[in-house]
Amino acid sequence: MRIDPSTLDLKEKVVSISRVTKVVKGGRNFRFSALVVVGDENGHVGVGTGKSIEIPEAIRKGIEDAKKNLVEVSIVGTTVPHEIHGKFGTGDVLIMPATEGTGVIAGGPARSVLELAGLKDVRAKSLGSNNPRNMVKATINGLANLRTAEDIAKLRGKSVEEIIG
């Protein structure tokens, strides 16, 4: 199910900008690549990349791409329902629930994703690559795979009490 970005009040955050080079016969062609995260701080977050000769244009393309890749995040209160591993390439991020008042404890790129997803109390640990693109995509992968007890109960056709035990 695709999420319509026009109905959401999205905020964007540029995670990284890098200069990339294409070597051709006549010399080097320089461009800028931007990694952008968008979210409504209410359970929706997406990541996108843009590339252009100028930085603002690369960021704009990244925002457009991120709006096409929105995912819904299960949030329980101000944290995640359970611990989860997110993986993408060599990026490996462990996302853990935290008690209220803890805040967002996460490194660089993962922090941007968690804040824009609307999580207020959560801990995250990067266990794999610290490449921003892999870290961001691993975090999004983990958040997309979160399920609340209600979701699981509905899928199994049971009550929440039967699931929790």
Curated annotation (Swiss-Prot):
InterPro entries tied to this protein: Ribosomal_Su5_D2-typ_SF (IPR020568), Ribosomal_uS5 (IPR000851), Ribosomal_uS5_bac-type (IPR005712), Ribosomal_uS5_C (IPR005324), Ribosomal_uS5_N (IPR013810), Ribosomal_uS5_N_CS (IPR018192), Ribsml_uS5_D2-typ_fold_subgr (IPR014721)
Keyword Nucleotidyltransferase: no
Protein known as: Small ribosomal subunit protein uS5
GO CC entries: small ribosomal subunit
Keywords: Ribonucleoprotein, Ribosomal protein, RNA-binding, rRNA-binding
Keyword Ribosomal protein listed: yes
Organism superkingdom: Bacteria
Domain S5 DRBM: residue ranges: 10-73
One Gene Ontology term from the biological process aspect of the record: translation
GO molecular function: rRNA binding; structural constituent of ribosome
Assembly, per entry: Part of the 30S ribosomal subunit. Contacts proteins S4 and S8.
Entry remark concerning the domains of this protein: The N-terminal domain interacts with the head of the 30S subunit; the C-terminal domain interacts with the body and contacts protein S4. The interaction surface between S4 and S5 is involved in control of translational fidelity.
Similarity comment text for this entry: Belongs to the universal ribosomal protein uS5 family.
Role, per record: With S4 and S12 plays an important role in translational accuracy. Located at the back of the 30S subunit body where it stabilizes the conformation of the head with respect to the body.
